[in-house]
Amino acid sequence: MSPSPTALFCLGLCLGRVPAQSGPLPKPSLQALPSSLVPLEKPVTLRCQGPPGVDLYRLEKLSSSRYQDQAVLFIPAMKRSLAGRYRCSYQNGSLWSLPSDQLELVATGVFAKPSLSAQPGPAVSSGGDVTLQCQTRYGFDQFALYKEGDPAPYKNPERWYRASFPIITVTAAHSGTYRCYSFSSRDPYLWSAPSDPLELVVTGTSVTPSRLPTEPPSPVAEFSEATAELTVSFTNEVFTTETSRSITASPKESDSPAGPARQYYTKGNLVRICLGAVILIILAGFLAEDWHSRRKRLRHRGRAVQRPLPPLPPLPLTRKSNGGQDGGRQDVHSRGLCS
């Protein structure tokens, strides 16, 4: 027996409500709480976050066979063996998501702390330059500079025993507390203890009420603002090339454009007006051409209707008598009788 149309209709509705998955599942996020820089013997929590309704989470440590099928990994005491790269993923049905971005879990306090100093001094005027120097007694080739409030430190190779972090064109955003770390490239996740804090003070700056933020900034905005114009350069003993990285924070834009932005918007409006005028001219030309063609067709039709009339028959010839008009009429009448 063939299925009825009603049953087929209900089946189609049921299948239409089943969500179809196209492509891989979106990747989750992995974070370390309270921080990815963990002192030895201190607790840390790794949390994998995906969409609601996940069937299974998997959190794994790369370069090893360690993994667990849970979204949260609590480490009560940080060990050297637990430092490294982590990532996570989740499963819905038979589909696995893309892996999360890698998280670098660093164990600090493995080696003795370095020293951090500022040249020419920790107090610098706005617009000036200052260099933060990190120095250690051990032959480390990797150094990291960390500013309180930033999500991640700056890591760069330097010369043995010492690293320089120049800050060009200091602004008020550079003021704060800094620390540095030293480590070896052979064990990139085993760091020294942090240096003693260095307070960088920027003088000659003032914040007007109009520049105060009206809402709490996002973490991305805090990172960009706190690292404005920070240039980090390094030189290696083997390689003579010098590289630098500059991060510039743009000020908060107002609602109305100013300066070059206003000129850009004015030019854009002029371009739109010119384009509109050109389009109107083209439409007017099309309308004029159409009106002219219609008038021409009507003129041709009028010529076709006005045909020449047939010629009239010739009138009979009459003779005028001496007696005037009456005599002529009598002559015609007499000729007609005779004929």
From Swiss-Prot:
Changing residue 95 to H: No effect on collagen binding. Megakaryocytes and platelets. GO terms for cellular component: cell surface; extracellular exosome; membrane raft; plasma membrane; tetraspanin-enriched microdomain. Disulfide bonds join 48-88, 134-180. Residues 26-104, 114-196 form the Ig-like C2-type domain. Gene3D superfamilies: Immunoglobulins. Residues 328-339 have a biased composition (Basic and acidic residues). The keyword Transmembrane applies. Residues 1-20 form the signal peptide. Associated with Fc receptor gamma chain. The GPVI:FcRgamma complex is associated with the Src kinase family FYN and LYN. Interacts with TRAF4. Interacts with COL1A1, but not with COL4A4. Collagen receptor involved in collagen-induced platelet adhesion and activation. Plays a key role in platelet procoagulant activity and subsequent thrombin and fibrin formation. This procoagulant function may contribute to arterial and venous thrombus formation. The signaling pathway involves the FcR gamma-chain, the Src kinases (likely FYN or LYN) and SYK, the adapter protein LAT and leads to the activation of PLCG2. This is Platelet glycoprotein VI. It comes from Homo sapiens.
